[in-house]
Amino acid sequence: VVSVAEEFFFFEATDNMRVYVDDGRPFIKRAGIRDQIYDYIVLDAFSGDYIPEHMLTREFLDEVRAIMNEDSVLVANTFSTSRLYDHESVTYQRAFGEFFNFKLPSTGNRIIVAQLEPLPPRAELVNRAQQFSDSLSKYGIPILEYPSRLSTRVDWDMSRRQLTDQYSPGNLLREK
């Protein structure tokens, strides 16, 4: 992932950041044991063929919460077109409360943005997008469109069971 980011997205690690490539759940658990706190956590462990079910559960999200502070942000790249959607959404909502859903109509993906504190108001998101607009436009990233696509609307079945270490049939639910 890092080499792809460097080659195609001009990513460069700096002295102000640390990048780790590791199995997510053991890494998160070790970080919690060491009382480490992270500002920005990216969860992008899913492929079209397989979902690591142990990274979908309430227990895992509680471990993620333990390494966050009030300013930290969790960004999870996941799916929007399977039976898993309702279960996963209920699980995130119970772990974080309200979260942002970012979906593009042309894909089956969604990005979940969650934090411990209440989500920022849309006007703040628009202001932040404007700050980055010039630098990102040269890469074809229409960041000014994104704040309007962030939704907190509950579009899932709230009666669905949350995913836990004891109940996580993610790969079965992934089937359409």
Where are these regions (language model features)?
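Surface-exposed beta-strand edges and their flanking turn/coil or helix-capping segments
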Residues: 7, 34, 89, 114, ...
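C-terminal substrate-binding/active-site "lid" region of AdoMet-derived donor-dependent transferases
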Residues: 58-123
